[in-house]
Regions:
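Conserved G/P- and acidic residue-centered "switch" motifs that form tight phosphate/ATP-binding loops
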Residues: 96
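Short, surface-exposed ligand- or partner-binding patches at beta-edge/loop junctions that are enriched
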Residues: 91-92
Length: 146
């Protein structure tokens, strides 16, 4: 179940937001950052969210690697990307699964409030056997290829 961001919440795993809610958080709060926790192959070949119109950049930190294996330095790399304690973070993956783990781990490390973006960048697989049902791209939010 999705929960609406609440500014009175203490830092921590704050739950889920849909792509539109994440976009609105990024628009309205200059402190909110996006961490895309997909793999480099996904960023390169599928595309990425484009926050340039907001004067922001996406932090790209892989949760796991293309050939398998978790990124043991994930939290350290999130911090190296400039994410600070107390700063709202929206985590994005392909379909909203890896980003849950990323948000929870960030919370355990003292970062956040941390949100998982439901549906992710590409969303669920539809009847067409393509990821064309929901997600950041399908909802028409800014993105770019390559």
């Amino acid at each position: 179940m999705s929960q609406t961001p609440d500014e009175s919440q203490q830092p921590g795993y704050a739950g889920d937001v849909d792509p539109q809610q994440a976009w609105e958080m990024l628009q309205s709060d200059p402190e909110t950052v996006m961490v895309d926790c997909r793999t480099e192959a996904e960023w390169t070949f599928v595309g990425t969210a484009d926050l340039g119109g907001l004067g922001k950049e996406v932090a790209f930190v892989p949760w796991n690697y293309f050939q398998g294996g978790l990124n043991e330095a994930f939290v350290e790399q999130v911090r190296e990307a400039g994410v600070r304690e107390g700063q709202p973070i929206v985590f994005l993956c392909r379909s909203g699964t890896r980003s849950v783990g990323a948000a929870k781990l960030a919370t355990e490390a003292g970062l956040g409030p941390a949100y998982n973006i439901l549906e992710g960048f590409e969303g669920a697989v539809g009847e067409s056997r393509h990821r064309d049902v929901d997600g950041w791209k399908v909802r028409g939010l800014p993105w770019r290829q390559g």
